[in-house]
């Protein structure tokens, strides 16, 4: 009797793969574990270590008396819940230290003070890093260098980041043993839909100022596979900020990013440990 033609049935098999780069990304806690604790405080930085961060990121400015302190904004209004609106550059460290910068987040953090760079350096565990963002210009590099040298911290534990291009150049000149990354963000033209700076403009700047790496806004419209491949060809490290979403984090993981800056280090580490999911058709012959 004739053989019944075989019927090819197609089933979807979910294949889980752990990519080689999946666990390679460093987790950088943006202003500390700032989703859960008041940003840029010792409480937020300590919590970041507890949540498994590889590095903390903090913003640093100069006071009127030349002290390097950790604060994002140029004034104190937001982190005091509006109780004090002082320009950091116009007041002394002693006056800034009278402010409570914790209770605006939660009562449990009442009493947190604006920390100095020296205090932040003192709580960095061995093997962990500080991404030190310079809020200002090249004039901050020498004061920061003095604090770093006096602290005795290893240069390998410090990464300096800055939007200001002249600051990047000054760091390369005065702190050649410390890595420096250029920070970049993008704006979209409402009429044309184009993003600026363009990829070509980014690479022109990199070629001119020669940082060790690029710390870029996590914008997949600009930062795509060809962008990353070019970064690697030209010898730059590849870092992104600020991601609190698991899907976005995995997208950049799969592009081979070196570090992800996040407000939620524990969550993003958990999300990055999820395997990459691929689907393929597997034919099964049934007689």
Give the label of every model feature segment.
Residues 20-287:
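Phosphate-group recognition and catalysis centered on beta-loop-alpha active-site segments
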Residues 9-20:
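Bacterial N-terminal signal peptides
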Residues 1-9:
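Positively charged n-region of N-terminal signal peptides that target proteins for export
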């Amino acid at each position: 009797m004739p053989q019944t033609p075989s019927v090819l049935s197609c089933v979807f098999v979910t294949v889980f793969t752990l990519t080689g780069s999946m666990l390679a990304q460093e987790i950088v806690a943006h202003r500390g574990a700032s989703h859960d604790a008041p940003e840029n405080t010792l409480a937020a930085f300590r919590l970041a270590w507890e949540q498994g961060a590889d590095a903390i990121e903090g913003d640093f400015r100069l006071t009127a008396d030349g002290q390097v302190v950790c604060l994002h904004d140029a004034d104190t209004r937001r982190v005091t819940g509006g109780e004090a609106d002082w320009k950091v550059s116009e007041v002394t460290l002693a006056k800034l230290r009278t402010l409570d910068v914790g209770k605006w987040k939660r009562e449990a953090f009442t009493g947190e003070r604006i920390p100095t760079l020296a205090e932040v350096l003192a709580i960095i565990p061995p093997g962990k890093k500080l991404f030190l963002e310079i809020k200002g210009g090249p004039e901050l590099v020498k004061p920061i260098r003095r604090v770093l040298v006096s602290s005795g911290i290893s240069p390998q534990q410090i990464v300096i980041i800055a939007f200001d291009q002249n600051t990047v150049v000054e760091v390369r000149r005065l702190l050649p043993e410390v890595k420096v990354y250029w920070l970049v963000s993008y704006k979209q033209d409402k009429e044309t839909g184009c993003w600026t700076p363009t990829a070509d403009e980014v690479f022109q700047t990199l070629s001119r100022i020669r940082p060790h790496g690029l710390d870029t806004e996590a914008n997949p419209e600009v930062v795509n596979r060809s962008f990353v491949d070019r970064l690697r060809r030209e010898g730059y490290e590849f870092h992104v900020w600020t991601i609190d979403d698991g899907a976005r984090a995995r997208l950049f993981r799969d592009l081979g990013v070196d570090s992800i800056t996040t407000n939620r280090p524990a969550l993003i580490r958990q999300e990055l440990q999820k395997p990459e999911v691929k689907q393929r058709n597997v034919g099964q012959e049934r007689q």
